[in-house]
Amino acid sequence: MGANYSEIQELLQQRADIQARMNLMPYDGNPEIKVSNDARYLYMRKRVAGKLTSTYVDLYSDELYQLLLRNAKERKDLNKALRKINKELAVLGYEDKELSTRVLQNLDFARANMKANIYDQAVLEGVATTFPQTEDIIENRKVSGVSATDVQKILNLKHAWEFILDRDVIQSESNYHMLCHIAKLVNEGFFYDGGRIRGIPVQIGGTSYVPPLPVESAVIGQIEEIRSRDKDPIETAIELCMYCMKTQVFKDGNKRASVIFANHYLIAQGMGLLVIPEKDVPEFKKLLVRYYEGEPLEFIGTFLKEHCWKRF
């Protein structure tokens, strides 16, 4: 499988991305219209264990019916793409591997905490939502008083977290290409290719630090060097996170992508989660500015280990 490694990793990422997209879709099945007492109602029809089931959606409207039709077509296309990817993986000799019990437990731990993690990340980004609003957005429910931009950011965080929690993806290396794919998901809807390395100067608010333009080969090499050091997994995860933040690898979404990237590494080691809790965001931002401006990693690293490392 060695010669086909890159191709297999790309297919696995595509497969996990499709599965994450399908998880975001609110409806599964084909729409049908039922009439009762001169009123029309919309249902979703789906075959489960050989039996047809029908789930109520809402009162009929042309707009909702067209939405359900588009949803059904998109899901059908995604299922077709999944079958194609699985065939290609089989041709390349790929077989699904068993994950260790510890990693499986960590995946469950991450899924159980995903809503809280997304809310904490949203607070770090200045997204103005309450936890109940964030929860409604994650569950694809309607919310009021929240900007379309903030809704998109939260959905993108959900998409990125679901991506790294896929069993195939968690077995993939925490390398530059993984970071780029996470950034692409985080920036979806805001940039044409949010996972492309930054090619323009940027400034960071609240600090005199101006990150130089990143060089792709240098970023690839530094990530590999950090991963190869003989350190505890939490220390490696923190260093990966802080290096990517300070480097400002992408045009936007660097904090979001860096945290999720670090969690991809940490979960794969079965070592918990790394998320800045809402109450610790102000202190983290102060330490982050000091780190940007030259303070050694150990100061913010100690803070992250003591206040932001969730273990199970």
Protein language model annotation of sequence segments:
Residues 1-41, 47-312:
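FIC/Doc superfamily catalytic core
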